[in-house]
Amino acid sequence: MKFEGTGIEEVSADLNKLDFIMESEGFVRADQWDYERVTYDRKYSMVEGTFYLRISGYATEGDVGSKKAHIQLLTPLLGKHYYPHGVEYGEGEEFPKSLIQSSKKTLAQLKEKLESITAEA
């Protein structure tokens, strides 16, 4: 499921500042990066299953490995984890309404924090 129009996809920011803010909102980058791309995930464990709110991005300057990069974020996605196959983000997936609302709230809070660092740039 895509969360279109959140404004997150318009954010471009320094990787280190981005890592700090994403972590403060419960997103983990861990080893999910290469030299040009990053992926931040927030895990939701519920009775209905395990879900991930994912925000990906790509380097417009520098490289992620050196921790000196400027990242352009992409449209947030919500996916359901299926063991052992992985996470499905397809439009055919069904998500609990409470999860969708929680994800929207998280994205709104995140957007607010991201605006503070993009205003500095």
PLM-predicted stretches and their roles:
Residues 12-17, 105:
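N-terminal amphipathic/basic helix or basic patch
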Residues 1-11:
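N-terminal "first-domain core" detector
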Residues 68-121:
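Intrinsically disordered, low-complexity regulatory regions enriched in serine/threonine/proline
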Residues 15-65, 79-84:
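Ser/Thr-rich, low-complexity intrinsically disordered terminal regions
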